[in-house]
């Protein structure tokens, strides 16, 4: 089933999510607060990613067919108009995310899932800025999600169970491999495991076991 998806913030993560959703057959609207960011950078990055996937035989249809489902939006409100799912990928600053989710809460349809790509911030620090915060959660990907399917779904204490279930279903149908956290923890699971591995690697180098 084709859905309407909005990607808010179109840097590396936001652009990669656009690839994920458009490749899955969804209509994707892109918005970035930086003037010209979508046209100058995001669309080019998206096309380059799709070209790579096509070269590797990883696309089921031509690049142009997928690109035809992606459009730049004139505003945040334009991007989320009629959206079923919104993926936020803006700066990792609580104040910025609170402002964005407040705007999303006002502009997005009441039934839309509002998800954040935050890589470290607990969702409860900013998701409650949105109206009806029970439809909000964190969907933290491995970067870039267009190539690595793992995504951590982390509900805030106020996130509805139905929201988690719908997000899991939507992301899985888009080709991702969602795992769900039982409750919040700073850095989520993946980052904490990665940091532990890096710390041990540095310890081994420091002790002279390897270089």
Which sequence ranges carry the predicted segments?
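Rossmann-like NAD(P)-binding element
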Residues: 33, 37, 52-113, 121
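Amphipathic alpha-helical segments within well-ordered protein domains
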Residues: 51, 151-154, 199-203
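Active-site-lining helix/loop region of Rossmann-like oxidoreductase modules
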Residues: 188, 195-211
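Rossmann-fold dinucleotide-binding core
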Residues: 113-192
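NAD(P)+-binding Rossmann beta1-loop-alpha1 motif at the extreme N-terminus of oxidoreductases
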Residues: 1-52, 107
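Hydrophobic/aromatic beta-strand patches that form the interior of the parallel beta-sheet core
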Residues: 29, 73, 87, 137-139, ...
């Amino acid at each position: 089933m084709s859905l309407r998806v909005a990607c808010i913030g179109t840097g590396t993560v936001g652009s990669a999510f656009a690839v994920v959703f458009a490749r899955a057959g969804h209509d994707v609207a892109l918005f970035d607060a930086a003037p010209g960011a979508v046209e100058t950078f995001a669309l080019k990055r998206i096309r380059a990613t799709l070209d790579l996937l096509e070269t590797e035989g990883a696309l089921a249809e031509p690049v142009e067919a997928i690109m035809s489902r992606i459009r730049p939006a004139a505003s945040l409100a334009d991007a989320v108009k009629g959206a079923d799912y919104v993926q936020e990928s803006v700066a990792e600053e609580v104040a910025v995310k609170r402002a964005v989710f407040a705007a999303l809460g006002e502009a997005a349809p009441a039934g839309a899932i509002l998800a954040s790509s935050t890589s470290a911030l607990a969702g409860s620090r900013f998701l409650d800025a949105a109206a009806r915060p029970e439809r909000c959660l964190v969907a933290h990907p491995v970067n870039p999600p267009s190539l690595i399917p793992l995504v951590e779904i982390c509900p805030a204490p106020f996130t509805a169970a139905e929201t988690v279930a719908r997000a899991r279903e939507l992301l899985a149908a888009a080709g991702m491999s969602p795992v769900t956290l039982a409750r919040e923890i700073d850095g989520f699971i993946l980052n904490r495991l990665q940091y532990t591995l890096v710390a041990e690697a540095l310890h081994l180098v420091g002790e002279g076991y390897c270089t």
